[in-house]
Amino acid sequence: MGCKSPEARKPISVKTGSFIENSAERNISLNKKENELIEQIILNDSLNDYISSNYGFYYYFNTKVDSTSYLPQFGDIINFNYNIKSINGETIYSKDEIKTQNYAMDKEEIFTGLREGLKLLSEGETATFIFPSQKAFGYYGDENKIGTNIPLICKVSVNKITKNQQ
């Protein structure tokens, strides 16, 4: 049991960026398939005028109020209802299951698409959003009813916006 200076361990194998490259390719392929599916839904829906948002999803207004109406800003409290459906229209969570929500804009965690969608709605408006999976619950799902990489349709109604007093 003598003193021995520590020896550096050598790596067993050299890792390349292949995992990340493969992951990126899978994501690009998934995104392309989802976009094609969403575009097909829009083409088949002649009743609604879809808007392509700057956030990377599509939506249309079920109920629209004056175009000069106030849109929520950072810290505003938004009282709203929504439901979640699969891309084929099957209800995953009903409005009654989710219940009325209060959300402090950009101060609390909700899924990305919903947070960005709420920024587009004024008090009294209702819109239907089609979110690709990366704007919904992404790879992990919601660990309950929503699985991995599932695009969603959400109908969102803003009941009230309380302006941030700060």
Predicted segments with their positions:
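Cross-family detector of peptidyl-prolyl cis-trans isomerase
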Residues: 2-166
